[in-house]
């Protein structure tokens, strides 16, 4: 049993009693040959060994390192009271089995992206990101200061899961293509790996969205199972070698403007933890949430230069009319989904309101500054 405030108080009282006895004996002149036995047993803190399953390949840069860093920080800050063993996708459960594993309690923790679970909890997509939505800084602000976190935990509560923000990729690229996209006609019949609402947008535009875990993407693209794939951005895309399987690299990543990653914890296991470990886990996740964003911001620049300058990748911008049509479709889908589901609507209204408010300020601050800087 973990040492609580009561047992600590008892320790202090026992120490004082022994010291008072010793002082009285010394004062009374009975100090010679006095042996005072101080034989108090201090309760040992209960230790915890948890398993964490992820939707990413083991030790994969950025995505896969986020849970590893959380595990290391928790063990260090708890002085070994908690040890978390991290398993990559497929080692114990499939990439898309993480949510169920944590929900059922077969594993205490998981690390993934909320949009993978749209079939279970449609509102979960907002906590990764939605097309033309919040950037990394904005979704962090909405989650931590705008009521998003409370909504997130409300959405996951029926599944016995306690979510914590745990990483962000920043704005992504649209993806890798084996044919040029010059108009909306080029989207028709296009088989592309793209999850979440982005996949729904592609489908309405005439494309064929495909769901595949990261570890299968290179082979699927190289063999023609799919015509295109989105993944993350230059840093991660370079490590998968997509430049060897596709010629064109399209931007902007309208579908994932600031993708937040999630640490999932079984609610029963979380409730049973002592307060100190809860604080340690929350603190570690918050530190890694920013650390991963910093890593992507720093590494994407170098990786993009290498893709273009060394590997000869053709960097292409999506035509304006294609982007405009995607935006119209995305807005329609968000509104329709909100109209069909009370929980989705509740989250959507909060997300939408925050985006409108933060966008108004960013137009005259960050957006205006970046435009001036790049002129």
Kindly give the residue locations of the regions a language model identified.
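A gly/proline- and charged-residue-enriched helix-loop-helix capping module
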Residues: 137-153
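Short, solvent-exposed secondary-structure boundary motifs
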Residues: 5, 151-156
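Sec-dependent signal peptide recognition
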Residues: 15-23
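Short, Lys/Arg-enriched N-terminal segments with co-localized hydrophobic residues
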Residues: 1-13
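N-terminal secretory/targeting leader peptides
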Residues: 30-139, 156-157, 162-375
């Amino acid at each position: 049993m973990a040492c609580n405030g009561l047992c600590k108080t008892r320790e202090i009282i026992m120490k004082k009693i022994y010291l008072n006895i010793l002082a009285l004996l010394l004062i009374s002149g009975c100090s010679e040959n006095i042996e005072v036995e101080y034989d108090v047993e201090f309760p040992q803190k209960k230790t915890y060994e948890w398993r964490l399953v992820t939707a990413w390949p083991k030790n994969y840069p950025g995505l896969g390192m986020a849970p590893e860093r959380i595990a290391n920080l928790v063990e260090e800050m708890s002085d070994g009271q908690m040890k978390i063993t991290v398993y990559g996708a497929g080692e114990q459960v499939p990439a898309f089995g993480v949510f169920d594993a944590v929900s059922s309690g077969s594993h205490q923790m998981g690390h993934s992206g909320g949009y993978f679970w749209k079939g279970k909890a449609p509102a979960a997509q907002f906590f990764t990101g939605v097309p033309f939505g919040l950037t990394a800084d904005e979704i962090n602000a909405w989650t931590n200061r705008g009521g998003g976190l409370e909504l997130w935990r409300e959405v996951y509560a029926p599944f016995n899961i306690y979510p914590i923000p745990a990483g962000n990729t920043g704005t992504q690229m649209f993806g890798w293509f084996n044919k040029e996209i010059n108009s909306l006609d080029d989207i028709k019949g296009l088989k592309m790996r793209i999850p979440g609402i982005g996949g729904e947008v592609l489908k309405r535009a005439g494309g064929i969205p495909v769901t595949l875990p990261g570890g299968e993407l290179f082979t699927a693209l190289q063999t023609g199972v799919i015509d295109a794939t989105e993944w993350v951005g230059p840093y991660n895309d370079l490590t998968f070698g997509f430049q060897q399987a596709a010629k064109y690299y399209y931007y902007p990543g309208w579908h994932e403007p600031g993708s937040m990653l999630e640490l999932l914890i079984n609610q029963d296991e979380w409730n049973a933890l002592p307060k100190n470990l809860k604080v340690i886990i929350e603190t570690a996740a918050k530190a890694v949430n920013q650390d991963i964003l910093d890593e992507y911001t720093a590494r994407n620049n170098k990786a993009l230069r290498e893709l273009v300058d060394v590997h000869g990748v053709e960097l292409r911008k999506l035509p304006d009319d294609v982007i405009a049509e995607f935006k119209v479709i995305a807005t329609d889908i968000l509104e329709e989904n909100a109209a069909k589901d009370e929980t989705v609507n509740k989250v959507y209204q909060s997300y939408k309101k925050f985006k409108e408010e933060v966008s108004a300020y960013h137009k005259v601050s960050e957006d205006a500054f970046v435009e001036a800087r790049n002129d």
